[in-house]
Amino acid sequence: MKNILILLWKPLSKHKIEILEIESLKKFYKVNFCEITKIIFPKYKKTTSRLNFKVTKIQNFKALIHFFNKNSFDLILNHTGIQKNTEVYKLLLRQETPILTSYENFISKNLFYPYKFLSLFKNFIFSVIFFFLKKKKLNEYSYLMSDKIENIKNVIGTNIIYGQNYAINEISKIKNKKKIIKNKVVFLDQNWGDNTDYDLYYDRKSINRFKKIFYKELILFLKKFEKEFNAKITVSLHPFSKKKNWIKYKDFNISINKTTSEIASSNLTIGLWSNSLSYAILLKKNILIINSKSFLNMTDEYNYANYVTRYINSSMPLSISESNSLHKDTISKFIIKPNNKYTTYKNFFLQAKNSKSIGLCSAIRNILSKNKTL
């Protein structure tokens, strides 16, 4: 049985295990997990997983060298997001083992004026280089979930596999099989402020101040929404949300690790900025994107909400900072109904143009069987 290493930058949730098709991989290969969080992000606190499989946690670069000296693998799935010019990636190359890196396309300010023109120019230059580059690096593979990835220079010279976002695979399993529940609305929790990712970029004291204000606004808004629309809200919890934090949603139905099916059976999805919005777009659901003035100090979150809204609709997100003044007519104006931009979003972010609907598991099997048809 061939040996696969999945290299991680942070713990995997149960949901992530499913979308990476790891259970399918285990049917064919011995799957190993190595987490290098402390090397990439020394400040990152959460380095444990709730899952019941063994994860080797590497604390420093020397330990990583020792790990590779002791172990050999038939393929390395690079799920870290590290750049190709880093020492870690150079170490991977020295293993003389096929390396498969998956790339997604994330929404950013580079999609809008004036940043868009610089981004397009850079991508054009790298695309020309990519087109004329004849020599391929035999052991480097790039799985593209979109052919418009922002850092196209990372895939130059590698063997390209045009694939699709895991969200498409998930949707294909449930589409047309879920009965829509009348007045059901799903809110996408992102574990804001409690997710340890925030500690990488922001001061914890500032986070705690913002968090207190934001959740007060959020709960008030969700209750207001239920009353105005005679709706029943289900909160789809972030996979790493701790039980002690669930109490803030005690007045609502809660669900965890079932985001796709919850959205499929709902009429409307509410969120700020979440990758899970992709499911709502693919399922052509009504979407309400919210924002809060308390996010002004968390600029990435505040801007992401604006970016998503601008890409699938021309209006801005609904500010929930003054929920008392919000009524059904006002809120309804911000609800985005399925439109042509949903398809544009799918083509831009969720599926490579030349995709053959190859999932990540199939891509790995083809590489290891030396299939040349990719």
Q: What is each of the regions a protein language model found here?
A:
Residues 121-202, 339-340, 352, 357, ...:
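A nucleotide-sugar donor-handling region in carbohydrate enzymes
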Residues 69, 137, 261-262:
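Structural alpha-helical scaffold elements that stabilize or flank donor/cofactor-binding regions
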Residues 55-64, 165-168, 234-283, 287:
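Donor nucleotide-activated moiety binding/catalytic core segment of transferases
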Residues 246-247, 275-350:
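Catalytic binding pocket for nucleotide-activated donors in carbohydrate/polymer assembly enzymes
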Residues 72, 140, 264-265:
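Alpha-helix C-terminal capping/helix-to-coil transition sites in glycosyltransferase folds
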Residues 94-99, 230-231, 284-286:
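A short helix->loop->beta-strand "cap" motif at the edges of active sites that frequently abuts
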Residues 37-40, 187-188, 211-256, 304-305:
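Catalytic donor nucleotide-activated moiety binding site of glycosyltransferases and closely related
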Residues 1-114, 194, 198-219, 373-374:
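N-terminal pre-catalytic "stem/leader" segment of glycosyltransferase-like enzymes
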